[in-house]
Amino acid sequence: MLDSSPRPPVVDTSRSPHVRLRPVPLDAVDLADDFWEPRRRINREVTLPSQYRHLEDTGRLDNFRRASRKIGGGYQGIYFNDSDVYKWLEAAAWTLAEGSDSELERMVDAAITEIEDAQRPDGYLNTYFTFERAAQRWTDFDLHEMYCAGHLFQAAVAHFRATGSERLLDVATRFADHICDTFGPEEGKRHAVDGHEEVEMALVELFRATGERRYLEGAQFFIDARGHGLLGRPYGQHEPSYSQDHEPLRDQSEVVGHTVRALYLYSGAADVYAETGELALLQALRRLWENMTTRRMYVSGGLGSRYEGEAFGGTSSSPTSGPTLRPAPLLPA
């Protein structure tokens, strides 16, 4: 049964059996102070519309129109451009949860229409792997297919919780069903993991929104399958640790590799623990948390001290110049 309660939480662990803190509904807090409210207003009135124009100007939305044969031409931009559309939709959805905005709603609905029309009959959706690259689907796991899917799932859950609409959620569940039909531990399914983690936590949140247990089981599979060298050398140059594929998660004790990927993985594993209560996952996450917060983190909370590979540094290695310290590593956490 779909969770359609009014103004549910951003991350809904209200029915997760192994969590102690319970989220509050979106409308339980009103940030009307002098610090946050002006920034939220700028986000609604300036930032989100500007970003939507950028999605148009850079061809990101045109990639969806091309996939549905509304326009011709070639694919525009880097292979993970779809994810930027989904990230914008997630941000716009949570903004709409604060109150109606006809212009923002128009942009959101327009983007969802292009996404709906671009989806393949089997549920697959990635505009990079359309037409000339359709035969290459699920052949190169360095190309962020599941990463993009995960951001779609999170945008869909956000849109559903913020507006009650199931339009984008229907797209997401069709794609999630395709992934769960294609990948898994069962005979005849693909045993593989994506080079860039993200889908793990997204599948759990999709499970929380829909009650469809196969999505939770899919997240468990991708966590279980990582750490067995399925990726080889990412991008032909990095060690397996770059994508946390060097050792099973339950055996890890040090945070290594690409910081954003690692935190998506750890967050997804924490989500799985919240639903299953698997002690081995919790023990591993506690070790990794201890290592990260006492040996790899800046006093500001920043992570990712190496420019090369946007990676964690060595033990207690936190230079004051040169590191990336991007905001992205903190988002999953």
Language-model region placement:
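Glycan-recognition and catalytic cores of secretory/periplasmic carbohydrate-active enzymes
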Residues: 1-333
